[in-house]
Amino acid sequence: MAQANSRSRNSATISYPEKRRARVNLGKREVEILKTPYLLETQIESYRKFLQKDIAAEKREDNGLHAAFKSVFPITSYSGYAVLEYVGYSLGGESTLFDVEECKLRGLTYAAPLKVNMRLVIYDKEAPAGKKAIKDIKEQEVYMGEIPLMTETGSLVINGTERVVVSQLHRSPGVFFEHDKGKTHSSGKLLYSARVIPYRGSWLDFEFDPKDCLFVRIDRRRKLPATVILRALGYDTEQILDMFYKTNHFHLNQETVTLDLIPQRLRGELAVVEIKDKKGKVIVEANRRISARHIRLIEKAEINKLELPDDYLYGKVIGKTIIDKETGEIIAHANEEITAELLKNLRATKTASLDTLYINEIECGPYVSDTLRLDTTTNQLEALVEIYRIMRPGEPPTKEAAESLFENLFFSPERYSLSAVGRMKFNRRVGRKELTGLDVLSKEDIVDVLRVLVDIRDGKGDVDDIDHLGNRRIRSVGEMAENQFRVGLVRVERAVKDRLSLADVENLMPQDLVNAKPVSAAIKEFFGSSQLSQFMDQNNPLSEITHKRRVSALGPGGLTRERAGFEVRDVHVTHYGRVCPIETPEGPNIGLINSLAVFARANEYGFLETPYRKVVDRVVTDETEYLSAIEEGDYYIAQANTNVDGKGRLVDDLISCRYKGEFTLTTPDKINYMDVSPRQIVSVAAALIPFLEHDDANRALMGSNMQRQAVPTIRPETPLVGTGMERTVAVDSGVTVIAKRSGVIDSVDASRIVVRVDRKETEDDDDIGVDIYNLTKFTRSNQNTCINQHPIVEVGDKVQKGDVLADGPSTDIGELALGQNLLVAFMPWNGYNFEDSILISERLVEEDRFTTIHIQEFTCVARDTKLGPEEITSDIPNVGESALAKLDESGIVHIGAEVNAGDILVGKVTPKGETQLTPEEKLLRAIFGEKASDVKDTSLRVTPGITGTVIDVRIFTREGIKKDERTLEIEKAELSKVEKDLNDELRVREDALFENLEKLLTGRVAAGGPNKLAKGTKITKSYLADLPRQKWFEIRLQDDAATKRLEASHEHFKELRETRDAKLKDSRQKLTQGGDLAPGVIKIVKVYLAVKRRIQPGDKMAGRHGNKGVISTIVPIEDMPYLEDGTPVDIVLNPLGVPSRMNIGQVLETHLGWAAKGLGKKIGEMIEKGADAKELRNSLKPIYDLSKTQRFDLEALEDPEIVTLAKNLRKGVPISSPVFDGATEEEIKQLLKMADLPTSGQAALYDGRTGKKFDRSVTVGYMYMLKLNHLVDDKMHARSTGSYSLVTQQPLGGKAQFGGQRFGEMEVWALEAYGAAYTLQEMLTVKSDDVAGRTRMYKNIVDGDHRMDAGMPESFNVLVKEIRSLAIDIGLEND
């Protein structure tokens, strides 16, 4: 008994789906230290920070909307007497008008209204000067447009479609130093440059030219000497030299020159004179180059003065201006070169000493000094004017204009901002300790940038690597939306400033001042049409998740495809654990669009960081720390698969690790960190590929990209060989239904699950604890695939919080299931699998293994035209009865009708212009009053190539237009459905309430009540059963506390009913009110068709290892090769597809899949023999004991659960082989042995047609195959008479335009080569652009006369016209 208790107690810790079907984990590492983080965190967190919706106005942090408002407000009028201040904002009332589903149906944006509290302060103009007196304060809430909200799954619904805003990887603001790699100048000299990139504002570039002078550019304009900007900052020549150079001090006598010697500065120079020590011993001979050894000797000899000849001074540069003390005149300017003449002058004026700049080829070049000579400006004003001329060419400069322009460029918070990130990067790069500061530049900043740049030119320091992830940061949805919002606010600011300056501002309210249009327009434009706001890829749950985790280097403020070179696209060492090195598109975007790695996240500054386990004194701890690429370089980081003993100590003497971006071997005592998991470096899609470590990178890339194109099949099947990520993806993608609280399943049907919540989970006594989950049924996804959820729980099942209750598309018992497990044989088969073709068995079609449902949406819009309104009706001119058979009286197709290409879905007629009538027609009109002929048929028809079943019709009518029968019918049906749902919900909640009441009342002593309940009697269950439930509330109890609870329950009961009524009223109003349709639209009808697509030749299939192919033929089951026991294989692949592609993972997967299936078969046989739970438990134990880590605890399951588990394992025991930590060959062999299968993984096959055995054994096994969304039905296309191009009169191209096949230049050559003259003439005239000829030919065919007269092609006329446009008169001569 004790054992059973412990078992049931433990049972709760295993999740419900795992009890139903658990994977055998073949990973080697101990339990993951870090659970895979929530995969959509980046998106949701970023947008939450932007909205700060549920945070009180006072507590909001300085980012998102709040920051945008604070940066623009307060707005002051030009006079300064009126100020508009920002107080706070609120988002949406109680809830948004429509929920996500309704917004999708009605084509609306899921958004909340933004209301901003503003305060208008007016100052008294009559107040005495210097004192501001407030005259009036008005506060008001102003509506500022709608802000889109994010759905729970991280997407946005804009105009009825789900969109995703992709994060952008852009260059971080800050300062960067780089060189041109020797490309600019022919000599190959490296030209260094520095660039200050702000978050917003002007760019500032400093660069060297080939002559080593420094220049500055502002906003990529014409270059100026760099010292101009220093002068504009207020520095003079002496100060500039002082900042960049040390000086040498010389004493002048009439004959000699004496230098105050600093020995270090002599290094590398030629000794002009002998240098002797005090004893007269020569340390350095004349004309010898002075080395470091000489310098040590000079220092030892303590020589501090050195007499030198005059010519040593020639060419040296004066550091400080020299003034004649007697006359006050300047003898020599700072930065002047010393000549013999100047030296003579200095001696003549008895100058005793002078300072020269210490310039040395090795460590201190003459760059700034040379630049000063190029600089024509002499003072601050001239410098400002020079800058003004460059920025505003052609405008006359004034002192004020020049000053304000320069001030606004880099020093005004409105126009320039480095942002916190930029300031942090800037300070770190120029070597400051303090990482915070002003968002604008200061004088010191500009000087520091120049200093570092000069140092780099002198060989001290390195240039930056722009592709390092410490120099690129992530901009997510929230940040981009905030920037757009700010742009809108700045536009508003201008208008408000003008209005504040009006005379009657005192009579205005904040609402009259602010126009919300620019703000909502900016937001709308961003979410609707920005390059980074993309139509969500909704093929399957994986493609949704991947799309939300995508990181793009393109987009506004990013790179362009054409300009991006090889380096930006390449894998960088800092991508490790941050960005996936595998998953990126093939084609022009390769490397520019990446995917976040599994554990990566963005830090507060937007830099990607990845977690590591701390290692202290050789011992690996369980503590994890996130490091960004900047911090990571300073540590030794070991791999995840490093050998560790039981106590967590590092075992090996040398350990492979990463340090400063290099892979090295080092001793264990140096290790600081260790990876958290082997799959840390890859993205979600790549982490789903088993045996990824055995695949070539190119194929792995294709594999991870193709998984995203898999179409959800009707009966999803989880892979037999997975990686353990399947469950995480299915749960995080949001396609499944997850239990919010733990409890017991109360009722289940196809569209609703009701859970009675555990008592301990309910917050208060009022909470009766019922959770109702409504499932999504057969709705259309963005890619026209079908979204349908179905329950996996049964009544009475216990579920925990976070368990999966219902599967969605491509999920199977809470695990991702993109394809099907097929029995595959690697062998050629009559050439049908030549060049990657695939041969499949008819069984797959028969069992609907790859049948998919696609839902198409057709929309018909009736508009108001100039000639009158269009009408939706079944009365269509010139259309036979048969064509109208599927329409109802209102002209709309019935639900359930099967329609083919060309069938009418919605009948619509459009008024056509009155034509001139003949007298006879006029007479007929007058007699019969016939008006039918003045409308034309513009009905919505099924597009070519589609056959399907109508599954739903939606009608939206403009407010005030009479609704037709069908609309009322649909509304009535919807309303009754809603009412039923609400009543069911009420019933369930009331049942729970009365159940709780029964527990409360039973056994209590009554003080009276209905049905002559006497005082002092105990209340029994039978008494309550006889009493109508409503009357229970009339019972009076003696216990006060219980009475209070009874009263509270009564209140709760009333509340439930009121809530139901309010919801019903709300739904009724929503259903009956007309939609706000676009202007000029009267009615919109949407028809949904479900198309069932079986797999057929021409469809594209693929495995998970980049092994893709097209189905060449479908072979009857009896003709397929079969195994010795008679099992025919499902699919035959070409063995030649493996060696050159080097994706060996598929072979290992095949072997392991076969073992998994074999084990399942053995369990199935046991069940058929009637094995009981004990036997099943014993046979499952050795299988689950194969897990070295994360062992599944069979003991925790009760007997019925063991039986269910075994039944679910009959199709095969699912195995997980984690990425870079997967099953070894030995383990695969062991599993094959356990399944009684040959350990070679090969078996004898027999030819299905002859029954003969194939010569040698064939690799057979189970592989997971996907059907990709490249279906032959979507590509097949044939043109009859269709549309023509306007100018050339040639048929259009492409399936979408119902176009033809282009008969191009080369095809014409082919016919010419054959000499097929008539065919050629036909191709170039009547089949193309001979307008008269093709109409004649059509007529002839109708008349049964199959002749053609070729005429003049239209393209010839176009050519003639083009030549005429060159003013050459050219024309045809008619004979």
Curated annotation (Swiss-Prot):
GO terms for biological process: DNA-templated transcription. The keyword Secreted does not apply. Coiled coil: none annotated. InterPro entries: DNA-dir_RNA_pol_bsu_ext_1_sf, DNA-dir_RNA_pol_bsu_external_1, DNA-dir_RNA_pol_su2, DNA-dir_RNAP_su2_dom, DNA-dir_RNAP_su2_hyb_sf, RNA_pol_bsu_bac, RNA_pol_bsu_CS, RNA_pol_bsu_protrusion. One of its GO terms (molecular function) is DNA-directed RNA polymerase activity. It holds the Pfam family RNA_pol_Rpb2_2. Its EC number is 2.7.7.6. GO terms for cellular component: DNA-directed RNA polymerase complex. It catalyses: RNA(n) + a ribonucleoside 5'-triphosphate = RNA(n+1) + diphosphate. Belongs to the RNA polymerase beta chain family. PANTHER family: DNA-DIRECTED RNA POLYMERASE I SUBUNIT 2. The RNAP catalytic core consists of 2 alpha, 1 beta, 1 beta' and 1 omega subunit. When a sigma factor is associated with the core the holoenzyme is formed, which can initiate transcription. This is DNA-directed RNA polymerase subunit beta. It comes from Coxiella burnetii (strain RSA 331 / Henzerling II).
